[in-house]
Structures are given as C-alpha cells and as structure tokens.
Amino acid sequence: MKFLEDKNPVIVSNRGPVEFFRKDGKIVMKRGAGGLVSTLLPVVEKFSGVWVSSAMTPEDAEVAAGYPENRVPLPEDDPRFTVSFVIVDRERYESYYSVISNPLLWFIQHYMWNTPYFPEIDDKIYLAWDEGYVHVNRKFADKVISEIERNEKNPLIMLQDYHLYLCPGFIKKKVGDVFLSQFIHIPWPQRDYFRILPEKMRESIINGLLSNTVLGFHIKRYCSNFMECCGDLGYDLDSENGVVLNGDEKTFVRNYPISVDPDSIRRTAKSDAFREKEDFVRKLKGDMFLIYRTDRADLSKNIIRGFRAYELFLKEHPEFHGKVKFLATGKPTRQQIREYRDYTDAVKGTVDEINSKYGNSSWKPIEYIHRADYELVAAAFKNYDCLIVNPIADGMNIVPKEAALMNEKSGTVILSENAGCYEELAEYVIGVNPFDIKETADAIYKALAMKSDERKRLSDGLKSKVRERTIYHWVNEQFDDFERLMK
C-alpha cells in the first residue's frame, strides 16, 4: 500500500461504517457488519481518510449536527478517520432509496420484474428519479467535492454500488481531472433487460458510470453485459482489453471477485455466544440430516422455491421423513417496500404449509428462524450436511464461501448457477437452475445420499478453492490497478 501514502482515500457508500442509535437514553455507536467495512475501514484509518455516507438514523443526524459540515472524527477518544454524513430530508431519501434504488434498479439488475405487469414507469417514478435519485446523488457528489477541496493530497475516490450511479458524473463535471473508481456489488443485467429503463435513465446511469477510470464487477459476465449496454448507447468498445471509450476518456471495466475474511470467521467460532448457539443447533439436528439456508428475506434469494424443492423431495422420498431437518434462518429486510412485506408473509406461509402437510407430533420438517443472529448462522455453518444457496441472481453471494470454511461435517453445497460465486466454485458444488424445483429436489437427494468419500472430496475441494482468495485479494487487486493507472 505504499502508493497510498500520498493519497487521500475517500470511500463513498449509501450505508457507512458506523451507525448511531439510542440505548437506555444515551446515543451509542455500532460498527457496521460485513466485508466491505472490515476491509476498507483499516485503509481509511491508516491514511486518515474519509468515509462519506448517508445519515441512516435520527441519531446519525443528531451526532453529525454537532460537528462542522457534519464531519464526525472517529474514534472519539483517538480520531483516525472521519465519517462525513450526507443528510437528506426523509421524503427525498425514500424516493431515492425505496422507489428508484429498490425496487426499480434492484429488480432490473436481478431480473425480478414480472414484465407483463410491472414496472409501471409513470409520472411518480419520474418524479422519484428527479427529486430523489438525482438529488441525493448530487448531494453525495457535493460532499465528495468538498472532501477533495479540503485536502492537499491526491484524492482516491472509491464509490460503492447501485445507489450512486450518477455521483461520479457530477463529481467529474465539477472537479475535472480526478481519479474515480466504483465497484458494483450486484449483477449487471443483459442489455435487453436493461432496456426496461427509459432511455433518459439508461443514458444518465451509463454516463455517470463512465466518469470512473475503473469500474469493477464481481465476474466477467457482468463486465460483458455492461459493455454491451454501453455499445447499445453508441459508445466505442475495446472488448479485448475491457475498455469503454467516451471521447478522450477511458473507463477500464474489470472483475474483482469478492471473498471472505478467514480470520474473522475463526474468531466467531471461539465466542461464548457461538458455543451456546451450537448447542441449540446440535439438539435441533439430533441424529437427523441437517439441511440449512440463510438469507435476507429478499425476493432475489428465491427462498420459496427452495422450500418447494424440499417439499417435492419429501414427497418423492418418504424414507427421509423424520430423518432430516431443514433449518432456515434469515432477517427481515426493506420492510418499508410492499413487495418485501408480501414476500416475507409468503415465505412464512410456505413454511407453515409444508410443516402442516408433512410434520407430526415428533417431527417438524422446517425450523424457520426469522431474525438476525450471526452466531446461530455460524453454528449452522459448522454443522450442516447440505447447504442450499439458490438465488434467482446474485452479484457474488459469499454464503458458500463462509460456510465452507466453517463446516466440519463434509457438508455438500447446492448452488444456483446464477450466483456470481458459481463461476469460481462450480467444480465442488451441485449446481442447479434456480427456477427448476425438480432439479433442486433431486440435488437434495443427491447431497444426502452421497457416499462419504465423495462428500469429503467436494468439501475439501471447496475449502481449498475458497482459501485461494480472501477479501484482501479483492481490495489489493483494485489497488494494483489504481496504482498502474494513476501513474
């Protein structure tokens, strides 16, 4: 990281590395979870950088208001970096986040719209675009520009994800010659599906993203899809070298597969909370096979088809009744959006239906725990015999990677061919079409009936494959490209 010594790293994301909330009448701080924070925050801390993010809670805004320009130095007792909060009125934020970012963009990028009926891109959507998405992206850009102007070091701007597609264009227009990069953590759709968006929105998004010098995706397929969308709008392509030409400017389109932090996973497995949850999982499993899945209650995760596949497995293989337990954990997400509330209810209804149909006084086929509990997830990772990860589409999905490193039962993974990680892991998983319930039911039987030596071969191969790339490879490969292109 020597090249960072004269740089001012500025990370830009909708959700930041910390969140403030009220507990027992006092405002307290919670560090954000996930690989993005654990990987990039040490960089920001080491080089006294800045993280620009939305004020997600009233307490975020309250704390930010106590500092000039809403720039909060952290940690409070020994500041090593700054969180620079973007504060937007609630109505505009909801238009930006809960109308345009999700569901409109999220559903397009995960192929989830029921196109004979939805989306209906009417005057309300256009208003949410103009007054919400465009407005908030301008606010983020203004904040980043302020950070660039206040620091004499060369700025290194790293924007994150689909909430901020327009932001780099606004920055470039004001600042001019500045190095911008952006990583998109979700899939990029094929060009025909991207055309669901009106041309005005498509052009604005592509123009914004092409203001970056480096644009990152998880896998090569998403890079190709993006470049084809650029070609549709008349941009010149150097497909062999992964470059989109925009006049005199070049955008280098690269794939950087994200991974996991093995050290963090090992630490989790040593905690008292983990041991307590492992006792629960082992009692739940008893001498049965344990099938496991964990998801946010997001429509893209394809939870209901996973349960329907299990239902078909039980129908076709009654010899497994009473000998298998399906544990599913997950947390509610985006419940302010009607489609998500309806889906959460449908998931619970499906579980109740299957348990009523096949269960009895001594056996409950599915145990569904609808809350966030990482120690419980980790305990299930360690003890599953079969893991199901069957998203309709997913940028990467690190669940199979985390689970493989923790599992001690030579567990087998059933993995959707539409998960980004399938490109890396295909050799050591049972791949399925996420829409094919029959194929997934057969995969469950194959996983549970598999001979122990084959289970071990797949499990050991998967562990080895995951260890080849940690989350630090993801960030270091980006820095290597930045260093080369900034010279």
Regions found by a protein language model. Name each.
Residues 1-487:
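Catalytic cores of carbohydrate-active enzymes across secretory and cytosolic contexts
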